[in-house]
Structures are given as C-alpha cells and as structure tokens.
UniProtKB/Swiss-Prot annotation:
Pathway: Cofactor biosynthesis; ubiquinone biosynthesis. It is a peripheral membrane protein. Catalyzes the decarboxylation of 3-octaprenyl-4-hydroxy benzoate to 2-octaprenylphenol, an intermediate step in ubiquinone biosynthesis. One of its GO terms (biological process) is ubiquinone biosynthetic process. Its cofactor is prenylated FMN; Mn(2+). Pfam families: UbiD, UbiD_C, UbiD_N. It comes from Citrobacter koseri (strain ATCC BAA-895 / CDC 4225-83 / SGSC4696). Prenylated FMN binds at I175, Y176, R177, R189, W190, L191, R194, G195. Its main location: membrane. Keywords: Cell membrane, Decarboxylase, Flavoprotein, FMN, Lyase, Manganese, Membrane, Metal-binding, Ubiquinone biosynthesis. Its EC number is 4.1.1.98. This is 3-octaprenyl-4-hydroxybenzoate carboxy-lyase. The active site is at D287 (proton donor). GO terms for cellular component: cytosol; plasma membrane.
Amino acid sequence: MKYHDLRDFLTLLEQQGELKRITLAVDPHLEMTEIADRTLRAGGPALLFENPKGYAMPVLCNLFGTPRRVAMGMGQEDVTALREVGKLLAFLKEPEPPKGFRDLFDKLPQFKQVLNMPTKRLRGAPCQQKVFSGDDVDLQRIPIMTCWPEDAAPLITWGLTVTRGPHKERQNLGIYRQQLIGKNKLIMRWLSHRGGALDFQEWCAAHPGERFPIAVALGADPATILGAVTPVPDTLSEYAFAGLLRGTKTEVVKCLSSDLEVPASAEIVLEGYIEPGEMAAEGPYGDHTGYYNEVDNFPVFTVTHITQREDAIYHSTYTGRPPDEPAVLGVALNEVFVPILQKQFPEIVDFYLPPEGCSYRLAVVTMKKQYAGHAKRVMMGVWSFLRQFMYTKFVIVCDDDVNARDWNDVIWAITTRMDPARDTVLVENTPIDYLDFASPISGLGSKMGLDATNKWPGETQREWGRPIKKDPEVTARIDAIWDELAIFNDGKGA
C-alpha cells in the first residue's frame, strides 16, 4: 500500500470503515479529547471533526489509534509484518557485504528499496498553496486542541519539526510538543538529547547569537510521520526511511524563509526561527504518564510564515495515561525493535514494551541464556544499544520458556527464579525523562534490572529447581476421553 499524501491514507481508511467523519460541532477545548479517548479505548476509527467550534479548519484525531492503522501507515497489512520493517532497519544499521551469489540474490529486494532513499525536490508544492507572512501570521486560526482541564494553553502535538545542524548534510525530523503563547509564538519542548535540540546546540556553538532556522510540518503523509517516530540509524534521514516505507522517493519543497526542506504534501507548514537565549516557561500539561508534568523553560519558536493547502486539515492527538496514541504506537513499533535488537544480540528471543509501562519505561526481554552473567549483559545492551531505551527504567530478563507478553509467566519467573539481593541490578545517576517526576533530580535518576532467568553454576551454589512437566502419554489418553467425561456440560451430550 502506497500513499502519496495524508488524504490518500484517509481515503483508504474510510473505504475500510476505519475513518469516521463527525459533522456535529465539537470544541477543540477538552471535548475532542473526551471523544477521541473514548473511541481509542474501544478500538474505534480515526476521527475527522469537520466542524470544530469557532474554526473553519477540520481536525483529524486518533489516526494511529490501533496497531493495525500504524501498520497500514507503514505500508503493511498487519502488525506482525512490521518485523520486516525492523529487519530492513537492522540491515541498514549494519549492512554486510553479500557472502556469495545466493546471498546477493536474497538481498536484492533490500538493495532495490534503497533506491527510494534520496528525496525528490519540487519547485512548487500543495503545502504552499496559501501563504501567510508578517502580520497575517496567526496561529490562533488553527484549531489547536487543549486536551486536559489543567493544561496551560492549547498544544500542538503532531508537528514534525525539521532542523539541520551546521555541520550536517541531512535534516532531522522529530516530534516535539509546542505550547501556543501568542499569534506567532510557540514553545519548542525538546529534550536535550533529541535530534532537534542537538542541532540547535551545535548551531549556537557555531553561530553565536544568530537565529536558528526551523520548520514544523503538520499533516504529512503517514510514512513521513511514522518515519519521525521510528528508530532509524543516525546516518539515515527520516525522509530517506519514509521513502523506503512508501516505495517511492519522499517529495520535499524548500521553505520560503530558509533552506530547510519540508514534506511537499503536508497540510500545514510553520516556518520561522529560534532566537538564542529566548526562553519561556512551558507547562504544566497532562502527559503520557497520566500526570501533569512540572513547568520548565524551553526555547521560543517565532513563526514568520504559515503555508498550507487550500482546504487544510489539522492533525492532532492527546496524551494521557495509557492507552493513548503514543502507547498504541509503542505496541506497533515494538515489532520493529525486535529484529534490530536481535541483529546485535542474536540470543534475544523476544522483546516487549508493555503499553501500561508508558510506552518505554519498562521492557521485558526473553533470551536463550548461554553462560553465567549473560542476562546482565543483555540488560546493559538494552539500555545502551538504541537511544530510544536510554530512558527505560526497568528491564526484566527471562529465559525463552517464558512468554514476554504474558504477565502470568513473567511474574512466575520473577518470584521463582530471583533472589532480590543477587539478581537486582541498580544503576544510579543515569539519564531519565524530564517528565519522570519520580526521579530525585530532573533528568537524572536510577535504573533497575531484574534477572529472572534460571541460574547457572557460578550464580548459585544450590541445586536448581526443575519445572514440573506433564507426562505426554497421560495427556494424550485424557485428551481421548475428555469429551466423554462431560465435566463442563453437566453430562448432557458429548
């Protein structure tokens, strides 16, 4: 499935009953969140609010509200097929030369996909059909949602922020929330280790006192949106990865106010700059943890141009206690992570981020253990191999006879195979999400690893327990007479 733009995707969703148009007037202030939250929890469709109260622009919510829609956005039929996306990323992260003709033939599909990586630059684009600049720039014309009662102000949640560092050829795409503070002002809330923040830091060092160009695309095609939240290798741009997902090159157009390139098919583009040193207090906001976060200072984004389609759609979401859209994305992207981790650690059998763990804060790993201390090596690997897991607070490692996605199995392993003193690893003073108010210092906290594997010689001096297993011959005999026993139908019928 290939989508040229967001509207192609919406057309398909509507054909498959995965999009609901809402003609009743609904307020972006709290009401849309209430409707979207109820719909997502019921596994319902994407929502297109066609008549937001007080605005002329439709609002799209709950676009990736089910794992299947995430898979569809990546060009796959179902979530299990996302393992293939992960295998492609693992190949791109550490490409190996073909070992022979047969291996070359097997890898031809991957090499063919790589041809779609370069972007296609356009002179004009749908996202620039209407242009607002100077005094005509007014962010308050956009139906930006206020999601929770104690939120500080309306909040842009699905903006693809485009940046480029002074020493980098490729652009970075990241999704950072942006608080509305004026008709042409937003607060750019990015964490210090994220790509956009790193680009800004490098710019300030290379060009002291100069304005940092920035652009935000709203309503891009699904491959580009999902490319911005997928663990692509640092050497690969999100635009290139989107081209791989889509099967065609990503079309971009140069901004009117800078050399940055934005998705040509985007619904809305905000162009402007960050003035070094201009900061503002951001928050509080209800977040994916289920709590309001504390107020902190972040850079101010001054918008100089708004470009958009003639009949633009505003793409939005809300975040709150799981399940929410980030949690659903986490469930789907979990399948992408598995092959990437297995490429580096072949002993890993499965990797699971439970959605109730707020997307990434707790991970369960199952593995084929091969030596004493092996589980601890895998723990450290999870924390360090991919940048996405530097904020993961808890890593539970189990043997491959445990189902990582079944809490009954995992809790059984923890309670029967762990000694708390021996098998708990605590690491202090590590990077932690700023939103994690449980950490003693903002941005710095501890991590816990739980080794719930069977212990090998050297890890214990005791005889280790053997799991109880049924006699297969007895099981087969009882299977043969089970219906005749009629235990669950009061003896009435077979």
